[in-house]
Amino acid sequence: MELNSVLKNSFEVDDAIDHLRSLGLFPHHDRVKSWDTRKMIDTINGADRNSFILDVGCNDSPILPMLRRLGFKNLYGCDLFLNTITYPALMKIVHSFYKRNYKPIIETYENKIFAISIQDLEKTNFQNNMFDYITSLSVIEHGVNIQNYFKEMNRILKKGGMLLTSSDYWPNKLVNKIISKDIRKMSPNNVFSKEEIEKDVIKAAEHNGFTLTKSIDFTYEDKVVHWKGGRNYTFIFFALKKE
């Protein structure tokens, strides 16, 4: 499996789901997001269980519960919002596989299993050089200032730490800025094009002290993601290392 790559087809989603299940985990409640979830989990899974890990935009993300199940201890999350609702689709999936209770993020936050905070990922209150890994699962397309993002992630990552980012992608530019009335459930502000990834995103990362762990495989086949209003695209994932 190529680490830094574009989601090519639905078969890669199926493979990711099977792989997560083989680890005793569960698919992402948005099925297609299991692809980049798997990449993040696989990248971190070989690390020391005492590593400090932050999931930005954690509210609808399964990353922290998955890492907890794999034995990681120092797990942090931040988001602008923390919903007080449960996720019926996610609960149904988990119950069908494991026949036991699974607590969504807000409940684990209330029970202090994770260190979850409400704050802006562009300007957090975390200490300098605090984290070994930071995960960002489909976050940066939602109105995040890319320069501020990489600057802040560099500040709070340890030297040699890794920033794992996924986002919406299509090689040619698609129409952007379609936002729902409820900002917490907004559709993607931006589906990044190949030119934007190369000239804007990766250049900004390099400017802020990051390097790609490996060049990105931009090979694609299908529009695997289907959003309301006829917006069809795919995902991209890339891992960056702090120099």
Stretch-by-stretch model annotation:
Residues 54, 61-123:
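Class I SAM-dependent methyltransferase SAM/SAH-binding core
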Residues 147-162:
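A short glycine-rich, Lys/Arg-flanked "PGG" loop and its adjoining helix->strand segment in the class I
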Residues 164-195:
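Conserved class I S-adenosyl-L-methionine
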Residues 132-144:
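A short SAM/SAH-binding and catalytic strip from SAM-dependent methyltransferases
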Residues 2-47:
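Class I SAM-dependent methyltransferase Rossmann-like catalytic core
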Residues 188-215:
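Short alpha-helix
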Residues 119-134:
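A short acidic, Gly/Pro-enriched loop at the edge of an enzyme's catalytic core
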